Curated annotation (Swiss-Prot):
Homotrimer; associates with NifD. InterPro entries: NifW. Belongs to the NifW family. May protect the nitrogenase Fe-Mo protein from oxidative damage. It holds the Pfam family NifW. This is Nitrogenase-stabilizing/protective protein NifW. The lineage of its organism: Bacteria, Bacillati, Cyanobacteriota, Cyanophyceae, Nostocales. GO terms for biological process: nitrogen fixation. Keywords: Nitrogen fixation.
Length: 105
Protein backbone atom coordinates (compact mmCIF):
# COMPACT_ATOMS: atom_id res chain seq x y z
CA UNK A 1 0.00 0.00 0.00
CA UNK A 2 1.50 3.30 -1.06
CA UNK A 3 -1.56 5.56 -0.98
CA UNK A 4 -2.35 8.43 1.34
CA UNK A 5 -5.35 9.05 3.55
CA UNK A 6 -6.47 11.79 1.13
CA UNK A 7 -6.42 9.31 -1.76
CA UNK A 8 -8.27 6.81 0.41
CA UNK A 9 -11.03 9.33 1.14
CA UNK A 10 -11.71 9.68 -2.61
CA UNK A 11 -12.40 5.96 -3.12
CA UNK A 12 -15.97 4.94 -3.84
CA UNK A 13 -16.24 1.44 -5.33
CA UNK A 14 -15.43 -1.79 -3.52
CA UNK A 15 -12.92 -2.68 -6.23
CA UNK A 16 -11.13 0.64 -5.67
CA UNK A 17 -10.67 -0.17 -1.98
CA UNK A 18 -9.26 -3.62 -2.77
CA UNK A 19 -6.91 -2.14 -5.39
CA UNK A 20 -5.83 0.67 -3.05
CA UNK A 21 -4.78 -1.89 -0.44
CA UNK A 22 -3.31 -4.25 -3.08
CA UNK A 23 -5.64 -7.01 -1.91
CA UNK A 24 -6.72 -9.90 -4.08
CA UNK A 25 -10.43 -10.66 -4.17
CA UNK A 26 -12.94 -12.84 -5.94
CA UNK A 27 -15.00 -10.60 -8.21
CA UNK A 28 -17.98 -12.93 -7.91
CA UNK A 29 -17.98 -12.59 -4.10
CA UNK A 30 -17.71 -8.81 -4.39
CA UNK A 31 -20.48 -8.62 -6.98
CA UNK A 32 -22.85 -10.61 -4.78
CA UNK A 33 -21.95 -8.99 -1.44
CA UNK A 34 -20.72 -5.53 -2.49
CA UNK A 35 -23.01 -3.42 -0.29
CA UNK A 36 -22.66 -5.75 2.65
CA UNK A 37 -18.86 -5.78 2.46
CA UNK A 38 -18.77 -1.99 2.27
CA UNK A 39 -21.23 -1.64 5.15
CA UNK A 40 -19.24 -4.03 7.36
CA UNK A 41 -16.01 -2.28 6.34
CA UNK A 42 -17.58 1.05 7.32
CA UNK A 43 -18.53 -0.35 10.73
CA UNK A 44 -14.99 -1.62 11.30
CA UNK A 45 -13.51 1.74 10.23
CA UNK A 46 -15.82 3.53 12.67
CA UNK A 47 -14.62 1.23 15.47
CA UNK A 48 -10.99 1.96 14.56
CA UNK A 49 -11.63 5.71 14.54
CA UNK A 50 -13.48 5.57 17.87
CA UNK A 51 -11.08 3.24 19.68
CA UNK A 52 -7.78 4.55 18.30
CA UNK A 53 -8.09 8.28 17.53
CA UNK A 54 -4.34 8.88 17.96
CA UNK A 55 -3.14 6.58 15.16
CA UNK A 56 -0.90 8.10 12.51
CA UNK A 57 -2.29 8.18 8.99
CA UNK A 58 -0.09 5.24 8.01
CA UNK A 59 -1.18 3.20 11.04
CA UNK A 60 -4.81 4.06 10.35
CA UNK A 61 -4.52 2.92 6.73
CA UNK A 62 -2.91 -0.32 7.91
CA UNK A 63 -5.83 -0.89 10.29
CA UNK A 64 -8.30 -0.04 7.52
CA UNK A 65 -6.61 -2.59 5.28
CA UNK A 66 -7.07 -5.27 7.93
CA UNK A 67 -10.68 -4.14 8.38
CA UNK A 68 -11.43 -4.54 4.67
CA UNK A 69 -9.90 -8.01 4.67
CA UNK A 70 -11.97 -8.92 7.73
CA UNK A 71 -15.18 -7.55 6.17
CA UNK A 72 -14.52 -9.47 2.96
CA UNK A 73 -13.81 -12.67 4.91
CA UNK A 74 -17.10 -12.34 6.81
CA UNK A 75 -19.04 -12.72 3.56
CA UNK A 76 -16.95 -15.61 2.34
CA UNK A 77 -17.82 -17.50 5.52
CA UNK A 78 -21.43 -16.37 6.05
CA UNK A 79 -24.41 -14.84 4.29
CA UNK A 80 -25.92 -11.38 4.23
CA UNK A 81 -28.98 -12.80 5.98
CA UNK A 82 -26.86 -14.17 8.83
CA UNK A 83 -25.10 -10.82 9.28
CA UNK A 84 -28.31 -8.73 9.13
CA UNK A 85 -26.50 -5.45 8.47
CA UNK A 86 -29.40 -3.67 6.84
CA UNK A 87 -32.75 -2.62 8.28
CA UNK A 88 -34.71 -4.85 5.92
CA UNK A 89 -33.27 -7.93 7.65
CA UNK A 90 -34.30 -6.70 11.08
CA UNK A 91 -37.83 -5.43 10.39
CA UNK A 92 -40.56 -7.56 11.84
CA UNK A 93 -43.43 -8.27 9.46
CA UNK A 94 -46.66 -6.49 10.35
CA UNK A 95 -49.99 -8.28 10.71
CA UNK A 96 -48.41 -11.72 10.62
CA UNK A 97 -49.20 -14.57 12.96
CA UNK A 98 -46.42 -17.10 13.18
CA UNK A 99 -47.06 -20.81 13.58
CA UNK A 100 -45.51 -20.75 17.05
CA UNK A 101 -48.15 -18.22 18.14
CA UNK A 102 -51.02 -20.49 17.13
CA UNK A 103 -52.16 -22.83 19.86
CA UNK A 104 -54.82 -25.48 19.72
CA UNK A 105 -57.58 -25.52 22.30
Amino acid sequence: MTGTIDEFKKLVDAEEFFQFFNMSYDLEVVNVHRLHILKKFSQYMHEIDENSPDLSQEEKLNQYSLALQKAYQVFIESTAYEQKLFKVFNDKPKNVVTLTEITSD
